[in-house]
Amino acid sequence: MLRVDRIDVSYGEVQILREVSFDIEDKEIVSLLGSNGAGKTTTVNSVSGILPVMTGSIFFMEENITNAAPYSRVALGLVQIPEGRRIFPSLTVMENLEMGSYLKGAKSVRKESLRFVMSLFPILETRKTQLAGTLSGGEQQMLAIGRGLMSKPMLLILDEPSLGLAPIVVSEIFEVVQRINKEGVTVLLVEQNISQALSISSRGFVLEEGCIALSGKGVELLGDPHIKTLYLGL
């Protein structure tokens, strides 16, 4: 479904990514892992078209999207939910969700998408007329995921969905990610919560200093001595 082939990305004169390559198959959950500053967000921002690629290529559904605009990638079914949620605080919950279905294809199935989102997050049904900025952090993350799902993604990119949330909410978010995947949506999960991310992922890729340092099946990476020592403190 997605193939990232040896991309280099820079901020000004500072090179952040060096020959980063990875792939995602249809209906997988794949984790992109690493410490702060490793290049995780830079990688997914390049995949979604927010950052330009200096060299290398990005393919989605066999189509070269390296130079495609972000909105074109969304129209193809590649949707990113950025770190920090970035909801519209002065709009209601329902208005935020409707903003996610602005493209023609998503708009035509808005009611169906809305039912699915409300089945995942029943709390949003009770909050639908409430201003999004008054929601709790966990509810805002649910809204951000829901808004992304309203775009009818084929590939959903989640950038640090558990960041700053209470443990009980984190568990709920990871359960929802699995439910979304079971409905046929492929997921790229960017996380610092490595143990939980790998436990639900078929495969994982570990970024260190802008390069892919490790890759493998989720269960294998959980048992890797390097992962245990550097990231899990074992």
Regions picked out by a protein language model, each given a short descriptive name:
Residues 52, 64-84, 107-114, 126-129, ...:
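ABC ATPase NBD coupling module
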Residues 33-35:
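The feature captures the beta-strand-to-loop junction immediately N-terminal to the Walker
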Residues 131-135, 139:
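Conserved ABC ATPase signature
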